[in-house]
């Protein structure tokens, strides 16, 4: 069996070597020649897996080690009898850590009390739902917009326009789609961006084209009261440098790049491939993850929850380093910028998640215990 895989997928040998020969190559370099004799294709979001890529090849299983599937031609897969799998939720905790770290950083820069802000979460899937749980555990005011879930469940959802009008902080966590009942391509276009309330913060850690980047540039140029945090960009790996210059924080699509999340994604695709091949899944991720540098934290039950959040979050992640590295990469010509964007992702240093922390509470505090559980950490 021949496996063609994105070279940046972690633990390829540990999970897949026993299935057959692994041929590694850059995700953006995959073409028809590369998959001409492949049985299994393993990718990330940078590879568009389409009919044009696979038609005529022997590929019968495609696994993407990512949450999203907008880079897969699922309709054609069904027609061609190609099985596929994604890794839903694999890096959700890492993205939540990124958003929380960004909020803490902006609060420090602007001298804002986070508890006094109203939060709008657009998209309540794997990432959004976890973020909502943390914000509510802190007792903060949260509004949620998710039209597909609202249509299916009813419940306490609001419209996107209400989010824009009422919320001081808006965090986007939608998939990218151009069709269907709720398309998200340019969900925030020029008209909607101009509805942002005075002093609003906009965070996009979903897909770049959920926000019209050209329109956002123009709005930020006109309105100095707004702040934007962007981890994703239209046209990646090319970045709108003028837009990046206007963002208070900018990073190269690494919000979900925690070590745990990336390796969890590989493990989920391994399990799916075992199912496809009707083989037992005998390899466990817990046996492969390295020990975290910070394993346990003690908190006094009397401490302020926001202080506790800051300690736990900063213990694993601070977005300012990634922002600085990203800005240093935005020099030179267009070709060098594109290479630098991918290099930052390929060479990304190990980053763990709050979920891996063990937290000991000295004393009793249900509020702190609820926060720790919402963050995914373990009370001991």
Curated annotation (Swiss-Prot):
GO CC entries: cytosol
**Mind telling me which Pfam families this protein's record contains?**
2-Hacid_dh, 2-Hacid_dh_C, DUF3410
List, alphabetically, the PANTHER family matched. FORMATE DEHYDROGENASE 1
Binding sites annotated in the UniProt record for NAD(+)? 126-127, 146, 174, 205-207, 231, 256
Q: Which UniProt keywords apply?
A: Cytoplasm, NAD, Oxidoreductase, Pyridoxine biosynthesis
Give the binding site residues for substrate.
45, 66, 257
Q: Where is the active site?
A: 207, 236, 253 (proton donor)
Q: What is the name listed in the Swiss-Prot or TrEMBL entry for this protein? A: Erythronate-4-phosphate dehydrogenase
Q: Which CDD domains does the record associate with it? A: ErythrP_dh
What subcellular locations does the record give?
Cytoplasm
Please name the source species. Pseudomonas syringae pv. syringae (strain B728a)
The entry describes its oligomerization and partners as: Homodimer.
One annotated GO biological process: 'de novo' pyridoxal 5'-phosphate biosynthetic process
Q: Which GO terms describe its molecular function?
A: 4-phosphoerythronate dehydrogenase activity; NAD binding; protein dimerization activity
| Pathway linked to the protein | Cofactor biosynthesis; pyridoxine 5'-phosphate biosynthesis; pyridoxine 5'-phosphate from D-erythrose 4-phosphate: step 2/5
Provide the E.C. number(s) assigned to this enzyme.
Answer: 1.1.1.290
Its biological function? Catalyzes the oxidation of erythronate-4-phosphate to 3-hydroxy-2-oxo-4-phosphonooxybutanoate.
| SUPFAM superfamilies in UniProt | Formate/glycerate dehydrogenase catalytic domain-like, NAD(P)-binding Rossmann-fold domains
Q: Which family does it belong to?
A: Belongs to the D-isomer specific 2-hydroxyacid dehydrogenase family. PdxB subfamily.
Its recorded reaction(s) are: 4-phospho-D-erythronate + NAD(+) = (R)-3-hydroxy-2-oxo-4-phosphooxybutanoate + NADH + H(+)
| First-listed, main subcellular location of the protein, grouped into a coarse class | cytoplasm
